[in-house]
Regions:
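A short helix->beta-strand "capping" segment at the edge of beta-propeller domains
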Residues: 33-59
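A short beta-strand motif characteristic of beta-propeller blades
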Residues: 49-56, 113-121, 162-167, 210-220, ...
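Beta-strand-rich domains and repeat architectures in extracellular enzymes and scaffolds
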Residues: 51-94, 127-130
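Repeated scaffold domains used in trafficking and secretory/extracellular systems
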Residues: 61-65, 123-130, 170-180, 222-231, ...
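Short coil/turn segments that connect the beta-strands within blades of beta-propeller domains
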Residues: 70-71, 135-136, 181-183, 235-237, ...
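Short, conserved, GDST-rich strand-edge loop motifs in beta-rich repeat architectures
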Residues: 76-100, 143-147, 242-257, 312-320
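Short loop/turn segments that connect beta-strands within beta-propeller blades
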Residues: 108-113, 156-161, 200-204, 265-268
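Loop/turn-rich, solvent-exposed surfaces of beta-rich toroidal or solenoidal domains
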Residues: 222-271
Length: 321
């Protein structure tokens, strides 16, 4: 092949790649729209079929959030070295001390083996929360282990596991989602009682992170679930999983009911809510900690990791179109 032919072939291949790559990047967007539409068809009567239960082959501590990229899981977790202690009376606006610990982001294969582990946070900021993947980065909030505190928001390259601090914020941010359509980041506070929105510039840094939290927050009008893990699902919506705990008396053992909320990011109101009537043998509700949902051939496949330390990845599927 002469030089001219090689140059022509190179040009053609380059043009084909430029056409294919955007299509590949956009392929996930219809999937998340399909997922959101199918979630809205779930109900209390939905039957979830167990697919597998995969033991996680290392100490997971207290898992918080999960994303699945291909056949790899990424799970945020807090290693509690010294539990927090409540004050008899609030001290400087806090109801407890900081405790001590280490924040982790684990990279795990589908057989439950640890591929990589990075630590996130600094000092008293060691509690990672719910996480989201935007097609390029995993967004991870790390906060003090108490309400009304402080947070550092990171984004992590899933290939290299390199973390980049994006900003700091004067409240406990317990979960984030990245709205890739209007270039904004959304956060939920301790117990998901408050919502935050940060506009992002071209570099992914917020343009309003220095604003007082009181100016940015909106109150969550739904009190059914405390959100643990949220994901962006297109059209300015997030899919949040979480739990509510109920006690017959203050000293009684809690009954834990898990569920899913499809929430509008425009006003923070739930568009759809449903319980998820699944529990592990330990009694822990499946949506208590990390959750990943995806559209499947049958309908929806859910990945759950509700238990601490010696965790199991529970995979369920339900038929819904």
């Amino acid at each position: 092949m002469d030089g001219f032919s090689r140059r022509c072939l190179t040009t053609i291949l380059t043009m084909l790649c430029l056409e294919v790559l955007p299509s590949a990047l956009m392929a996930a967007e219809p999937d998340r729209d399909v997922l959101a539409d199918r979630v809205a068809k779930l109900s209390r009567g939905t039957q979830w079929k167990p697919i597998s239960a995969v033991p996680i082959n290392f100490l997971t501590h207290h898992p918080q959030g999960m994303v699945k990229i291909g056949d790899t899981l990424f799970v945020s977790s807090v290693e509690i070295q010294q539990p927090t202690k409540r004050f008899p009376q609030p001290v400087d606006g806090y109801d407890r001390d900081t405790g001590a610990g280490v924040g982790h982001l684990f990279k795990i294969d589908m057989k439950g083996n640890l591929i990589a582990d990075i630590t996130l946070g600094e000092g008293t900021i060691y509690h990672p929360g719910g996480i989201d993947y935007d097609g390029k980065y995993i967004w991870v909030p790390v906060a003090e282990y108490r309400p009304n505190s402080r947070s550092i928001i990171y984004r992590v390259d899933p290939e290299t596991m390199k973390a980049e601090e994006m900003f700091r914020f004067a409240d406990h941010v317990g979960g984030v989602v990245h709205n890739t359509e209007d270039k904004s980041l959304h956060g939920v506070s301790w117990g998901s009682r408050r919502f935050y929105r940060w506009s992002l510039d071209a570099s992914g840094k917020p343009t309003n992170a220095s604003e007082a939290p009181e100016k940015l927050r909106a109150l969550n009008t739904s009190h059914y679930l405390d959100y643990q893990d949220c994901k962006y699902v297109g059209k300015s919506r997030m899919l949040c999983s979480g739990v509510t705990e109920m006690r017959v008396t203050p000293d009684a053992a809690p009954f834990r009911l898990g569920g899913l909320d499809l929430v509008s990011l425009a006003d923070g109101r739930p568009l759809f809510q449903t319980p998820v009537l699944l529990w592990a043998a330990s009694g822990m509700d499946m949506t208590h900690n990390p959750v990943w949902m995806e559209a499947s051939d049958a309908g929806i496949r859910g990945y759950f990791m509700p238990e601490d330390d010696k965790s199991t990845l529970y995979i369920y599927e339900t038929e819904v179109k």
